[in-house]
Amino acid sequence: MSNFTAEDKAAITSLWGKVNVEDAGGETLGRLLVVYPWTQRFFDSFGSLSSPSAIMGNPKVKAHGVKVLTSLGEAIKNLDDLKGTFDQLSELHCDKLHVDPENFRLLGNVLVTVLAILHGKEFTPEVQASRQKMVAGVASALGSRYH
């Protein structure tokens, strides 16, 4: 089931085609760890996360950010089945990693902020509304195992 209109899908896919996953991924995960420092506990193996500059310059943060945004790219290809797309990741984050599902919402909001910064005037209110709908859908799909 999908709550995305044709206009939503067009806005989401159009902007995503312009996203540099390497730049946006590291920036998004880095900002999540800086703005919401309690999320750092899930990344103990990443080395130094002792300051904003250490986090933003950490190659493991950047690499994992790319992995996260690559998964989001898959979601964009499957907007009508976000739950199915993220079923295995939901299971991993719930059963093995024990990540609070609220963190998925926070990550989505940080991503929207990063995309707004990177895409400036192209990131219109309509694009933002569609993107917010998408990250909310992804957060719900990732949190589905918790329900």
UniProtKB/Swiss-Prot annotation:
Question: Gene3D superfamilies this protein is in?
Answer: Globins (1.10.490.10)
Q: Which GO terms describe its biological process?
A: hydrogen peroxide catabolic process
Q: Which GO terms describe its molecular function?
A: haptoglobin binding; heme binding; hemoglobin alpha binding; metal ion binding; organic acid binding; oxygen binding; oxygen carrier activity; peroxidase activity
Identify residues that carry Phosphoserine.
Answer: 45, 51, 53, 140
Q: What keyword terms does UniProt attach to this protein?
A: Acetylation, Heme, Iron, Metal-binding, Oxygen transport, Phosphoprotein, S-nitrosylation, Transport
According to UniProt, the tissues expressing it are described as: Red blood cells.
Phosphothreonine PTM positions: 13
* Residues annotated with S-nitrosocysteine modification: 94
InterPro entries, per the entry: Globin, Globin-like_sf, Globin/Proto, Hemoglobin_b, Hemoglobin_oxygen_transport
Looking at the keywords, is Acetylation present?
yes
* Boundaries of every Globin domain copy: 3-147
GO cellular component terms, A-Z: blood microparticle; haptoglobin-hemoglobin complex; hemoglobin complex
N6-acetyllysine: residues carrying this PTM: 60, 83
Residues that coordinate or bind heme b: 64, 93
Please give the CDD domains that the UniProt record associates with this protein.
Hb-beta-like
Entry-linked PANTHER family: HEMOGLOBIN FAMILY MEMBER, HEMOGLOBIN SUBUNIT GAMMA-1
Assembly and binders? Heterotetramer of two alpha chains and two gamma chains in fetal hemoglobin (Hb F).
- Function recorded in the entry: Gamma chains make up the fetal hemoglobin F, in combination with alpha chains.
Family recorded in the similarity comment: Belongs to the globin family.
Name recorded for this polypeptide: Hemoglobin subunit gamma-1
Q: What is the species of this protein?
A: Plecturocebus moloch (Dusky titi monkey)
Gene from which this protein is expressed: HBG1
